[in-house]
Amino acid sequence: MFKIGDIQLKNRVVLAPMAGVCNSAFRLTVKEFGAGLVCAEMVSDKAILYNNARTMGMLYIDEREKPLSLQIFGGKKETLVEAAKFVDQNTTADIIDINMGCPVPKITKCDAGAKWLLDPDKIYEMVSAVVDAVNKPVTVKMRMGWDEDHIFAVKNAQAVERAGGKAVALHGRTRVQMYEGTANWDIIKEVKQSVSIPVIGNGDVKTPQDAKRMLDETGVDGVMIGRAALGNPWMIYRTVQYLETGKLKEEPQVREKMAVCKLHLDRLIDLKGENVAVREMRKHAAWYLKGVKGNANVRNEINHCETREEFVQLLDAFTVEVEAKELQNAKVG
């Protein structure tokens, strides 16, 4: 367990902020599987200040999710500070996180996201201004560098600490790598040794064993899990249990997976309405179905679903089909 500012986390497992994924429906589901902290998807500072309707919806927080970190991004100090003040005063988020890791060109060309990684002095200036303007603890999520020739992870993390930031989450890849190659955990270890604020490691934590290895090898305070949790909140539960007991829980059976998928769908419908939710849930269903044998047909059919009823019927029929095959195989065996 560790604290970010005055916010106590019940364990060391953190859900990463993933754009287009980490809305309240997904976060709450992951929270119920034991995450110590969940992070909301990044929100544009300018969109907050323009009072954009879609963006205001992205700021919605279910109190059952807490503690929660709400992430903002931007390239100008003035707008970032004003957006942070809005989040501070108008949401129940526990932590305000600043994105310095997003590698996507449309973000970096606005001098936001990973573009900050090139200038530790700018990081200090921006973080300091936000810290001075808000009451909630401020954290930063960053990558280790822009490219192999511009890795300032230690200086950047130290700048965050000097500016009053309460924690750093570090992804061990450069901006140029995007999500390719392997994460450099040695850099994460260096950063942990260079600052006294909590450091959360991120990158290539695909199994509970990976999480323990990251903690052991780098000394970080927490592990951040992103893509491995897509359609798989059991990854969070199994990691928490493994870190606490040393025992590995079994993977879920298809009926349990489809039940949670349906719960996720219903929460998304409550959040966004049936039309939007069903379409958005198609990608999530593909993730929930990953690893289940014979899922090709149902995935294809789900991609044409327009209603909750269709969606649920397909998942239920697939569950019965898989269980029948498993029973048949057990008899043969």
From Swiss-Prot:
Cofactor(s) in the UniProt record: FMN
Keywords tagged on the record: Flavoprotein, FMN, NADP, Oxidoreductase, RNA-binding, tRNA processing, tRNA-binding
Gene3D superfamilies the UniProt entry points to: Aldolase class I (3.20.20.70), Putative flavin oxidoreducatase, domain 2 (1.10.1200.80)
Binding locations of FMN: P17, M18, A19, Q71, K141, N202, G203, D204, G226, R227
EC category name: oxidoreductase
Entry EC number(s): 1.3.1.-
Active site: C102 (proton donor)
Entry-linked InterPro entries: Aldolase_TIM, DUS-like_FMN-bd, DUS_fam, DusB-like, tRNA-dHydroUridine_Synthase_C, tRNA_hU_synthase_CS
Function of the protein: Catalyzes the synthesis of 5,6-dihydrouridine (D), a modified base found in the D-loop of most tRNAs, via the reduction of the C5-C6 double bond in target uridines.
PANTHER family cross-referenced by the UniProt entry: TRNA-DIHYDROURIDINE(47) SYNTHASE [NAD(P)(+)]-LIKE
Name under which the protein is recorded: Probable tRNA-dihydrouridine synthase 1
Gene name per UniProt: dus1
